[in-house]
Amino acid sequence: MSTPARRRLMRDFKRLQEDPPAGVSGAPSENNIMVWNAVIFGPEGTPFEDGTFKLTIEFTEEYPNKPPTVRFVSKMFHPNVYADGSICLDILQNRWSPTYDVSSILTSIQSLLDEPNPNSPANSQAAQLYQENKREYEKRVSAIVEQSWRDC
């Protein structure tokens, strides 16, 4: 069944294949275009560098008018990521726009890894360490980067 949301997701997938952004990838799951599996590679020059982080993206039939639900499947230690892997990012909530596509969602999350917003913490411990003890924060991030290799 072809719906506007499904047609849009096919376009998003085609665009992602034809013009893949650096450091991110994503594709619909085998039997459901409404559920995607994605990977974000830790940005170079950040504590997340060399990490391989898996995510799931779940769309509704209201996409692109409503944002998808995006969660890290890989363990994540970040000020803006909840314990269940869900992400506190304005474009996935109140600043969503139908002009955003899968590519822009993934690159925005990749940018968030490097530039957390400690004023809107989903993980207060990570936010506190990020602001007050960068060395310990980076140590904790290194541990999840190493764990991401085992999870691949």
From Swiss-Prot:
Post-translational modification: Phosphorylation at Ser-120 by CDK9 increases activity towards histone H2B.
Record-linked SMART domains: UBCc
GO molecular function terms attached to this record: ATP binding; ubiquitin binding; ubiquitin conjugating enzyme activity; ubiquitin protein ligase binding; ubiquitin-protein transferase activity
EC number: 2.3.2.23
Pathway: Protein modification; protein ubiquitination
Record SUPFAM superfamilies: UBC-like
Keyword presence, Transmembrane: no
GO biological process, one term: protein polyubiquitination
Pfam families: UQ_con (PF00179)
Catalytic activity: S-ubiquitinyl-[E1 ubiquitin-activating enzyme]-L-cysteine + [E2 ubiquitin-conjugating enzyme]-L-cysteine = [E1 ubiquitin-activating enzyme]-L-cysteine + S-ubiquitinyl-[E2 ubiquitin-conjugating enzyme]-L-cysteine
Xref: InterPro entries: Ub_conjugating_enzyme, UBQ-conjugat_E2_core, UBQ-conjugating_AS, UBQ-conjugating_enzyme/RWD
Keywords on record: ATP-binding, Chromatin regulator, Disease variant, DNA damage, DNA repair, Endosome, Intellectual disability, Lysosome, Nucleotide-binding, Phosphoprotein, Transferase, Ubl conjugation pathway
Modified positions (Phosphoserine) in chain numbering: S120
GO cellular component terms listed in the entry, alphabetical order: chromatin; cytosol; HULC complex; late endosome; lysosome; nucleoplasm
Annotated catalytic residues: C88
Enzyme class: transferase
Disease named in the record: Intellectual developmental disorder, X-linked, syndromic, Nascimento-type: A disorder characterized by significantly below average general intellectual functioning associated with impairments in adaptive behavior and manifested during the developmental period. MRXSN features include dysmorphic facies, hirsutism, skin and nails abnormalities, obesity, speech anomalies and seizures.
Task performed by this protein: E2 ubiquitin-conjugating enzyme that accepts ubiquitin from the ubiquitin-activating enzyme E1 and transfers it to a E3 ubiquitin-protein ligase. In vitro catalyzes 'Lys-11', as well as 'Lys-48'-linked polyubiquitination. Together with the E3 enzyme BRE1 (RNF20 and/or RNF40), plays a role in transcription regulation by catalyzing the monoubiquitination of histone H2B at 'Lys-120' to form H2BK120ub1. H2BK120ub1 gives a specific tag for epigenetic transcriptional activation, elongation by RNA polymerase II, telomeric silencing, and is also a prerequisite for H3K4me and H3K79me formation.
Family: Belongs to the ubiquitin-conjugating enzyme family.
The protein's name in its UniProt record: Ubiquitin-conjugating enzyme E2 A
